[in-house]
Amino acid sequence: MNDILSIAPRDKAEILAQALPYIRKFHGKTMVIKYGGNAMTDPALQADFAEDVVLLKLVGMNPVVVHGGGPQIETALNRLGKKGEFIQGMRVTDAETMEVVEWVLAGEVQQDIVGLIHQAGGKAVGLTGRDGGLIRARKLKMVDNKDPNIEYDVGQVGDIVSIDPSVVRALQDDAFIPVISPIGFGEENESYNINADVVASKLATVLQAEKLVLLTNTPGVLDKAGSLLTDLTAREIDALFADGTISGGMLPKISGALDAAKAGVNAVHIIDGRVPHAMLLEILTDQAYGTMIRSH
C-alpha cells in the first residue's frame, strides 16, 4: 500500500470517514472475490491485493478468495512443450494437462496467495474442491453457443454438481480467509479443471454472499467500440452474447455473474484488477468502478 502511505493525513481521514458507512453496512457479510489477470502476475498488485483482503477481514467482513492461474498454467505447459487449446473460453484439459493444472493451482499459485496474506498480517488457508467435499463435479458437456447440435470434448473440464460450503464457513468462523483453487472431484475420485469465474459465482450463491467481485484485465464489460458498459441487465447481456460482443474468456465470466445475480447475490461487479486497490474502491466507496451485473 505504498501509494496510500504517501497520502496526506487530512486526505486519509477523509477516505476513512467515507468508508465508515460501508464498513457498518457490510460488517459480517461475505464477499466472494475472483482473483485473476494481471493482479496475479504483477508483484506490486499482488501485495496490494493481499493487503486489501486482510483489511476487509480486519474491519469485520468475510472475504473468500477463488483464484485463477491461466498465465501460470500456460507457462508450465510451454515448459513441457505442450500447447494450450481453448474452446469457448474453456481450457481443453487432457490427463497430462490436468496434472499440470493441479500442480500449478494448488501447489504454486494458491500457496503464493496464502503466503502474501500471511505476510500482510492475515490468516489464510488454501483449499481445493476435494477438501471437505467442497466441490463435486462431472465432465462438462459443452455445446456450440450458436448451434446446440455441435458438441465439443474438452477433456477433464468440470461442470459443478454441488458445493458443500461447510468447510468454508468453519474457516470463516475461525477468522481464517479461505483461498480456493478451482479444482473439483468426481464420482470416481477423478479431478476436474473448473473455470474459476464459474466456481466463484456458484460459491457466492451458496454462501449467500453480499457481493461477488471479479478482478479482470479490462475496465469491465466493453461494447464493440471499446466503451465501458457500467450497468447491465439480463436482457442486455443476452443481446451482447447474440451479437458477439461478449466472447471468448468473457463468456463463462459473464454467464456466471448473471447466474449469481439471478440467484440472489446482492451485487456482482466486474472490475479492473490492474488498478491498485480497485477492490477497496468498489466495496468501501460510493464510486462505481467497472461493470455491475443485475438480473433485471
Swiss-Prot record:
Family: Belongs to the acetylglutamate kinase family. ArgB subfamily.
UniProt xrefs under Gene3D superfamilies: Acetylglutamate kinase-like
Function noted in UniProt: Catalyzes the ATP-dependent phosphorylation of N-acetyl-L-glutamate.
Pathway annotation: Amino-acid biosynthesis; L-arginine biosynthesis; N(2)-acetyl-L-ornithine from L-glutamate: step 2/4
Site (Transition state stabilizer) location in chain: 34, 253
NCBIfam families tied to this protein: argB (TIGR00761)
Top-level EC class: transferase
Organism the protein comes from: Delftia acidovorans (strain DSM 14801 / SPH-1)
Protein name as annotated: Acetylglutamate kinase
Keywords recorded for this protein, A-Z: Amino-acid biosynthesis, Arginine biosynthesis, ATP-binding, Cytoplasm, Kinase, Nucleotide-binding, Transferase
Record carries keyword Repressor: no
One Gene Ontology cellular component annotation held by this UniProt entry: cytoplasm
Enzymatic reactions: N-acetyl-L-glutamate + ATP = N-acetyl-L-glutamyl 5-phosphate + ADP
